[in-house]
Amino acid sequence: MEVKVRQAPATPSQIARDLRQSEGGRLLYVVPRLTPALRAAAEHGLAVVAVEEGVVMVEGHEYRPLAAVATTPSVPKSSRRMPWGRFALLRVLCRTREPRTQAQLAEEAGITQAAVSQSLSKLSRLVVRGSNGWSAANGDDLARRFLSEYPGAGGIGVSWFALDSVNAQADKALKAGLNENAILSGDVGADRIAPWRIPAKAIIYASAGLDLAKVGFARSTDERATLEVRVPADPTLWSTANAYAGDRRPRVADPLMVAHDILRTGGADAGDAVAHVLKQLTREWDAG
């Protein structure tokens, strides 16, 4: 098999030329991400590994190999650095209206104090500086800012299916992922924060891949999946979950991550489910 590594996705003309030159042999592209042209070419003899997305395409079939899941979260290689720290700061500022020092915010967000200082300067009127530290001018505004700008946790996801209730599946996956710091998000996370609708899909963030086949799950397509395990590129998820959990071991991601994942997975009443999570967050923020 001939392997071609490209720093940018190939154009349709480059793909056609490389396929001709391979003269019927197997050709493998290693690229940062998939494009429509690469997906189409994967139907006709081209194999593709999209490194940033953790996706392999062979003969038109898409795979997200469990073996490709890193043992620790890592930021995807990109020409543009993702501001994970700024998004984490937005989330922890929404936790309470009580002022906190930059050192306290840095600990909660899992970033450096210098990164906090830089991010606060960019938030302008959304934050207020007082004698005891920094706080959000309005928690709702920060929440909207996060939900409108956050691109997702990235990393590599593996889809699973089981016949148990989604809540039961989530508990089983949490137990299996105890050593990988598994936490809940999406529908099931919302059910633990502000119960409102029956969860349709569980999202689990873990620091390493989980082989859930050992506990009764089957690998699945994204469309049929009842549970997704994701090793995120965003390294701040555990810090913000810890901040919201207080002295307890976190079982659920922070509320804004949960709200984001509800919107990501969708559903006819996703907007209402998010509203219930944010309403609970607002109550806690107002209570200080």
Give the location of each predicted region.
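Electropositive nucleic-acid-contacting surfaces
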Residues: 144, 148-149, 160, 164
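Charged, structured surface patches that assemble and position nucleic-acid processing machinery
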Residues: 42-59
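Short, Lys/Arg-enriched N-terminal segment that forms or immediately precedes the first helix
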Residues: 63-79
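Short gly/ser-rich loop at a beta-strand->alpha-helix junction or flexible surface loop bordering the NTP-binding
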Residues: 154-236, 241
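DNA-contacting interfaces and partner/effector-binding or oligomerization modules
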Residues: 1-45, 200, 206, 223
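Loop-centered beta-sheet repeat module
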Residues: 83-147
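Residue-level marker of regulatory loop/turn positions in helix-turn-helix DNA-binding domains and
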Residues: 81-82, 251
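Hydrophobic alpha-helical interaction segments
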Residues: 211-288
